């Protein structure tokens, strides 16, 4: 490929490609005319490919050191990914464990191991992951509806990822792993400066919201997408929506009550700001909050600042 691009692809190394607008690994084989766009880390898809590959690297290193462990990539937070690790021996994760996992990850990066892509019948993949004890992947694949599925192996360790991965571990040079709360935080590169780590940003409220969400998902038996798919197949979609709406309404009531207390305080609150990206539900939330504030005896005036 470099012979077709003697001047290079850009400032940063290419790690994936879009083929007819679908992300593919660099080992994807095209047998006829295709529209190809090469991607580096600064692109949204390129960053996603890098981070997925990095997560696989972390899982591989943890399994090498703690064969009975269960590692769960919980949520993106603080410019990284929060992960929980159950070592299988009943002990809490410690800094020594983090150091050992980091060292093993560096060894794998230095060895430049290949991420190998495999295509098999979905039934074969389900049976393989069931034997490995990956219940979440089994649940997801059982409800995918696909006849064939792609999975990846790293030095013989299999895992399932929906999107493409980088060609080899040698591409994953920038990252950091540290102890964070009751788990660990996998930090990733800055999207605009891939040679540097993204700056750490403490997000305690976001972390609390994610933790509460996981708690409620567990209570409802929805630990992964496969569980949601199965619930929908059982005709429970309407109930799930109603429960989610009830939980949100409960939160809005709590917010309204807190605002009411602050309005009646010695230094009263006079304005409440609601922020969020386009089409995220700000106006709807504003109307629902206004109703609850009126129920508290207040007379809120709502208006949109982006309605020019």
Question: PLM features: residue spans?
Answer:
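Hydrophobic anchor at the beta1->P-loop junction of P-loop NTPases
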Residues: 272-274
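Conserved glycine(s) of the Walker
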Residues: 281
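Auxiliary tRNA-acceptor-end handling modules of aminoacyl-tRNA synthetases
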Residues: 13, 28-47, 61, 70-255, ...
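Short beta-strand-centered segment that lines the nucleotide-binding/catalytic pocket of NTP-utilizing
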Residues: 295-308
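Active/ligand-binding-proximal structured segments within catalytic/core domains
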Residues: 2-6, 47-65
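Short acidic beta-strand-loop surface patches of small beta-rich interaction domains
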Residues: 12-28
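P-loop (Walker A) phosphate-binding loop of NTP-binding proteins
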Residues: 277
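Hydrophobic positions on the alpha1 helix immediately C-terminal to the Walker A/P-loop
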Residues: 284-285, 289
């Amino acid at each position: 490929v470099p012979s077709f691009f003697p001047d290079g692809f850009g400032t940063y190394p290419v790690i994936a490609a879009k083929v007819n607008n679908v992300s593919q690994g660099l080992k994807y084989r095209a047998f006829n005319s295709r529209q190809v766009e090469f991607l580096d880390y600064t692109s949204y898809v390129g960053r996603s490919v890098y981070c997925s590959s990095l997560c696989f690297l972390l899982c591989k290193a943890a399994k090498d050191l703690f064969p009975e462990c269960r590692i769960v990539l919980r949520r993106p937070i603080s410019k990284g990914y929060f992960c929980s690790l159950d070592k299988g021996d009943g002990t809490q994760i410690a800094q020594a464990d983090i150091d050992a996992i980091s060292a093993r990850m560096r060894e794998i990066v230095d060895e430049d191991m290949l991420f190998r892509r495999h295509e098999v019948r979905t039934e074969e993949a389900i049976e393989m992951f069931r034997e490995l004890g990956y219940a979440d992947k089994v649940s997801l694949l059982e409800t995918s509806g696909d006849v064939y599925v792609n999975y990846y192996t790293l030095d013989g360790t299999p895992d399932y990822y929906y999107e493409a991965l980088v060609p080899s571990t040698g591409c994953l040079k920038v990252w950091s792993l540290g102890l964070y709360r009751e788990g660990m935080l996998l930090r990733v590169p800055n999207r605009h400066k891939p040679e540097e780590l993204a700056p750490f940003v403490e997000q305690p409220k976001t972390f609390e919201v994610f933790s509460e969400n996981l708690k409620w998902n567990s209570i409802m038996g929805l630990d992964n997408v496969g569980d949601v798919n199965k619930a929908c197949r059982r005709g429970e979609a309407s109930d799930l929506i109603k429960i989610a709406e009830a939980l949100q309404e409960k939160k809005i009531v709590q917010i309204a009550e807190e605002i009411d207390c602050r309005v009646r305080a010695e230094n009263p609150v006079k304005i409440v700001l609601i922020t969020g990206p386009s089409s995220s539900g700000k106006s709807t939330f504003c109307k629902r909050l206004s109703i609850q504030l009126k129920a508290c005896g207040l007379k809120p005036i709502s208006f949109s600042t982006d309605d020019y």
